[in-house]
């Protein structure tokens, strides 16, 4: 198998587990503090508001449109291409004093005045605050249910100490990612929820690969402390981890740089989540299982007595 690193010597990952724990606790505490003070910059999918799609005769200049809307008092508008360079989507937060139709006409007028181009309204939609609340609850419930299912799955496949480490690693990834979004006030919409669920699956996959090697080595390596066996297991899977994470990050970075405003938040969430998830599969999931006292006997298969074995032992 192709390898980036051919480690002839086992890397002592667990030697740095205390430093990693301190770092993780600091990042989680900082994220929770940021979330509690600034919270999240919810998008229209969650807060409600107005969505207006307009068409141009030639490729639209988004910066010119933003400047035109800002001059007319619509500085909170989100402007991005939709479908093609001639189609533009404008998102606005709820405005109680203006109806949806009136707001649409004001937007069209502001764009025409600011750009001097012919503009056609394609569609206008209004997302009520009740729908936004339902989406918020559904998104949070989706993440919670996924964590519970993962806890049950890993408990059945491996052992409860490893399951606790896996779930804590996933919670660690989500909290830190949301903390960065809160600190930077990046808009959170449904694509961000999809990205978080993707991060959960990606991080879990990486963790399961490491755990599978840990279980295999616990059964094969008769000598050595649990920390030594974990170091050997992580070292053996390190090349696979770097190849998988690296190739995925190349694609995500391309999306981040060239994907446009519509998927910028999605790419940012994946970029943060994959980076933090690679770290947590080593220094949160595995290290926490070690702190909880994982031993060889916990992962050894149960011995099954053969029928009639007691008669075979008789002289």
From Swiss-Prot:
Family, per entry: Belongs to the SecD/SecF family. SecF subfamily.
GO molecular function: protein-transporting ATPase activity
Xref: Gene3D superfamilies: Multidrug efflux transporter AcrB transmembrane domain
Keyword Transmembrane helix found: yes
Biological source species: Vibrio alginolyticus
Subunit structure, as described in the record: Forms a complex with SecD. Part of the essential Sec protein translocation apparatus which comprises SecA, SecYEG and auxiliary proteins SecDF-YajC and YidC.
HAMAP family membership: SecF_B
Gene: secF
Keyword match Transport: yes
Protein name: Protein translocase subunit SecF
Subcellular location: Cell membrane
Bilayer topology term: Multi-pass membrane protein
Xref: Pfam families: Sec_GG (PF07549), SecD_SecF_C (PF02355)
One GO CC term on file: plasma membrane
């Amino acid at each position: 198998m192709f390898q980036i690193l051919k480690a002839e010597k086992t890397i002592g990952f667990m030697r740095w587990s205390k430093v990693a724990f301190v770092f993780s606790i600091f990042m989680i505490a900082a994220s929770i503090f940021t979330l509690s003070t600034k919270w999240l910059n919810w998008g229209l999918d969650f807060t409600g508001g107005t969505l207006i799609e307009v068409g141009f005769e030639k490729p639209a200049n988004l910066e010119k449109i933003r400047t035109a809307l800002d001059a007319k008092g619509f500085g909170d508008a989100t402007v991005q291409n939709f479908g093609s360079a001639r189609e533009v989507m404008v998102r606005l937060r709820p405005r109680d004093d203006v109806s949806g139709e009136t707001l649409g006409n004001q937007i069209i007028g502001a764009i025409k005045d600011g750009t001097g181009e012919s503009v056609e309204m394609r569609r206008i939609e209004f997302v009520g605050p009740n729908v936004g609340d339902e989406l918020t609850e559904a998104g949070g419930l989706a993440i919670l249910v996924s964590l519970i299912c993962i806890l049950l799955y890993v408990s059945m496949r491996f052992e409860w100490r490893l399951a606790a480490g896996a779930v804590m690693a996933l919670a660690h990834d989500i909290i830190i990612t949301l903390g960065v979004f809160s600190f930077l006030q990046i808009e959170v919409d449904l694509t961000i929820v999809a990205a978080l669920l993707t991060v959960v699956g990606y991080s879990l996959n990486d963790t399961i690969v490491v755990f599978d090697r840990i279980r295999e080595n616990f059964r094969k390596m008769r000598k050595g402390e649990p920390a030594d066996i974990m170091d050997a297991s992580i070292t053996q899977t390190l090349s696979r981890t770097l190849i998988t994470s690296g190739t995925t990050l190349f694609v995500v970075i391309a999306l981040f740089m060239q994907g446009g405003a519509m998927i910028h938040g999605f790419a940012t969430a994946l970029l943060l989540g994959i980076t933090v998830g690679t770290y947590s599969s080593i220094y949160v999931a595995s290290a926490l299982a070690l702190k909880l006292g994982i031993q060889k006997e916990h992962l050894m298969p149960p011995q099954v007595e053969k029928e009639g074995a007691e008669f075979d032992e008789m002289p």
